[in-house]
Design a protein with these regions (language model features):
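Membrane-embedded alpha-helical bundles of multi-pass transporters/translocases
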Residues: 1-377
């Protein structure tokens, strides 16, 4: 590959990064407002602890089979067939993955619904009976959203592989909007449950229905089938398993936070959740945007076995990410107190809540560059 074509790839990554960064920025702003709405409508207490802990099991399924591994591994599988002028076969594999793995995720959600009570002991054993009951109820309410995340991740992957980033970038915006609307319009009557209803509604609209439409615009061809003998399906599984294990490990920090937090004073899980959400704003804006935008091009280079160009693009992307995240991390640590007060000062949080949230934000920001590198590696 010539230097000119390498520069062209860099420009494509930059253009795609711009689209994704704009989406991530808007999503993080909505994420700010989402957490602000929780703090404004509910405050911080054992009720909010139960709400945030209720994301643990759904998030685990999301990390394991939807949010990262399946969508990421499908892109190189599909681009492999496209690079070999076998796109029809690529659509056949797409249909198999959607059908077979869709049945699998539905089965996992059903098991989660059945055993949510037992799993609750592993997630937050320190909750009192009231918090535990609410925690289990909210978990069961939000679990079906993972079906939408799974299907949406595959339909988004098709769009990414086709160089279409706009509609997939809208998914988190609609998802966050659903949570906000659920809280604003339902929390006065149903309390924290209103936010959980918003989680389900946002997932259905943004991560499922909209992504089906986007995949249709990208030319997706789907016909249900269970052809698990196709080599493309097993290539997908082969690529997925190690990434499933690696990505699910990132879930461990959320589980640890909620496990230990359940033994601490009420609102501890809420403080930790607020701090982590704030840390993820610059992390997502830089790390997630660069990672999502660069991956389809890196996958294409790998499929074409252009390893020298792959290494060149990967190194330049990684260096750029570190160059941006290290100073952002330092600035966030230094300004954690005013940042937290700016976001949460006009809510039901007290000064002690703000101080605790600022401390967690500073602590989480220390590892921001490492979390950012994960999006690429």
């Amino acid at each position: 590959m010539s230097v000119v074509s390498t520069e062209t790839l860099n420009r494509r990554i930059a253009a795609a990064t711009g689209i994704v960064m704009a989406s991530v920025l808007l999503s993080r702003i909505l994420g700010f407002f989402r957490e602000w709405t929780v703090a404004h409508q509910i405050g911080s207490s054992g009720v909010t602890d139960a709400y945030y802990a209720a994301f643990t099991l759904p998030d685990f399924l999301n990390y394991l089979i939807a949010g990262a591994s399946l969508s990421v591994t499908f892109i190189p599988v599909f681009t492999k067939y496209a690079a070999e002028n076998r796109e029809d076969e690529g659509w056949h594999v797409f249909s198999t993955v959607v059908t077979v793995m869709g049945v699998a995720v539905v089965a996992l959600v059903i098991l989660g619904e059945i055993f949510a009570g037992r799993i609750a002991t592993l997630i937050a054993p320190g909750f009192n009976p009231g918090e535990r009951t609410l925690f289990i109820f909210l978990t069961r309410l939000m679990l079906p959203a993972q079906i939408c995340f799974y299907e949406g991740s595959i339909f988004s992957a098709v769009q990414y592989a086709k160089g279409r980033f706009l509609i997939p970038s809208l998914a988190p915006l609609i998802y966050n909007t659903g949570i906000i609307l659920g809280g604003v319009f339902l929390s006065s009557r149903y309390g924290i449950t209103g936010f959980a209803v918003g989680v389900l509604g946002g997932a259905v609209c943004g991560n499922f229905l909209l992504q089906i439409y986007g995949a249709h615009l990208a030319g997706a061809r789907f016909k249900p089938n269970f052809n698990i003998r196709h080599p493309g399906f097993w290539l997908f599984i082969k690529l997925s398993v190690p990434i499933m294990l690696a990505v699910s490990l990132s879930f461990a920090d959320d589980w640890i936070i909620r496990w230990f937090g359940s033994y601490l004073q009420p609102a501890s899980i809420t403080w930790l959740s607020y701090g982590k959400v704030l840390m993820r704003v610059p992390l997502g804006l830089v790390g997630q945007a660069i990672g999502v935008a660069s991956f389809p091009i890196l996958a294409q280079l790998y499929s074409e076995r252009k390893f020298e160009d792959l290494n060149r693009i990967l190194n330049s992307t990684f260096k750029g990410l570190i160059f941006l995240l290290v100073p952002i991390s330092a600035l966030t640590i230094a300004q954690s107190q005013p940042l937290v007060h700016l976001v949460f000062s006009h809510t039901r949080l007290h000064e002690a809540d703000l101080q605790a949230t600022a401390a967690t934000l500073a602590f989480f920001s220390i590892g921001m560059f490492a979390w950012g590198a994960q999006y690429i590696l």
